[in-house]
């Protein structure tokens, strides 16, 4: 099976790339700008190019067809329109990575299926993903463009730790705070349910969709079946670090008032209780089951992080903001 990944080195796509490289019968090419290609398996063909330069990519891929094109780095409608122009008639399946944050907010029911309405007034990122889906489904209905839409939720991997909020430089600063006995912020009272999924589990399901005729024209989400409260998530991270984290609970409204850009990630995503019904992916990929519990996966992720000083990026601006918010919230904030 001849496959092209646009991207191929991120949290989600990197795990898929590594798993495919270990399997027979797959001829994988990744197309990206080459900035993160150091750990690509030797069997994977690499093309350096900017997918946003349509003429350049058309020339690079001239004469090539693919069984599957996997798009991991399209975020706005113009990018998927470009892909339709580039790949219509040249691929048998086009898999678009959307987002489970596209689902209705606030939810009318906490159990999410693929038929849950798509609407997110709180986050432009999610609205753009919805618009991308609409473009692709219109192309499927009108011209038969062979799209499959995949909606991940909160997926993590080696070195990436799933937190409710963190600074622009990643999760390390909050991990460091936990290790040093400093408090960290948990939005709300920490009792809302959330789902985190290890990238290796996600990859297994994604690979089962490759070339799958039953997935054409279909949206499907891929998540773990494990539901945890945010308190549990932080406590499990603390256990893996060998510490009891000091959690300070602060309302999402207050956090957004102090940092408006948190509205999307919180009200549009992580402050909602969500439970995913994964019946559809299990029907499309018989035998799939997310098998990595969070307490297992996060230990592996933290072990990787501790061995990589280049990922241990201090974020003094975020650190100071967290201290400032906790001071402002006291005594209205309560600690666990």
Model-found features: residue ranges?
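N-terminal Rossmann NAD(P)H-binding glycine-rich loop of SDR-like oxidoreductase domains
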Residues: 3-26
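Conserved Rossmann-fold cofactor-binding substructure of NAD(P)-dependent oxidoreductases
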Residues: 48-66, 78-81
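Short-chain dehydrogenase/reductase
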Residues: 110-114, 119-134, 154, 164-172, ...
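Glycine/proline-rich active-site loop of Rossmann-fold NAD(P)-dependent oxidoreductases
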Residues: 143, 157-173, 209-220, 243-244
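A conserved pocket-lining segment of Rossmann-fold NAD(P)-dependent short-chain dehydrogenase/reductase
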Residues: 174-197
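Mid/C-terminal beta-alpha module of Rossmann-like enzyme folds, strongest
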Residues: 208-267, 278, 283, 300, ...
């Amino acid at each position: 099976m001849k496959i092209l990944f646009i991207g191929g080195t991120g949290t989600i796509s990197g795990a898929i790339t590594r798993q495919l490289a270990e399997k027979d019968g797959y001829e994988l090419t990744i197309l990206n700008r080459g900035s993160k290609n150091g750990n690509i398996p030797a069997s994977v063909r690499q093309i350096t190019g900017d997918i946003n330069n349509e003429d350049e990519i058309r020339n690079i891929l001239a004469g090539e067809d693919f069984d599957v094109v996997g798009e991991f780095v399209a975020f706005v409608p113009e990018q998927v329109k470009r892909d339709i122009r580039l790949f219509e008639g040249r691929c048998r399946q086009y898999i678009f990575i959307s987002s489970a944050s596209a689902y209705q907010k606030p939810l009318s029911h906490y159990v999410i299926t693929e038929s849950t309405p798509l609407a997110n007034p709180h986050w432009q990122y999610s609205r753009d993903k919805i618009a991308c889906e609409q473009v692709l489904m219109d192309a499927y209905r009108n011209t038969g463009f062979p799209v499959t839409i995949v909606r991940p939720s909160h997926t993590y991997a080696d070195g990436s730790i799933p937190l409710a909020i963190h600074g622009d430089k990643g999760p390390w600063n909050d991990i460091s705070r936990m290790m040093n006995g400093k408090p960290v912020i948990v939005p709300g009272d920490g009792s809302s349910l959330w789902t985190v999924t290890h990238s290796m589990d996600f990859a297994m399901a994604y690979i089962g969709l490759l070339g799958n005729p039953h997935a054409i024209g279909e949206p499907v989400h891929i998540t773990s079946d494990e539901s945890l409260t945010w308190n549990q998530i932080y406590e499990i991270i603390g256990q893996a670090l060998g510490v009891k984290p000091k959690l300070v609970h602060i309302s999402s409204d207050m956090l957004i008032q102090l940092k408006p850009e948190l509205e999307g990630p919180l009200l549009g995503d992580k402050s909602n209780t969500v439970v995913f019904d994964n019946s559809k992916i299990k029907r499309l990929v018989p035998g799939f089951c997310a098998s990595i519990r969070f307490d297992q996966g996060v230990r592996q992720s933290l072990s990787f992080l501790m061995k990589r000083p280049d990922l241990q990026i201090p974020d003094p601006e975020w650190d100071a903001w967290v201290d400032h918010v906790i001071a402002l919230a006291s005594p209205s904030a309560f600690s666990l």
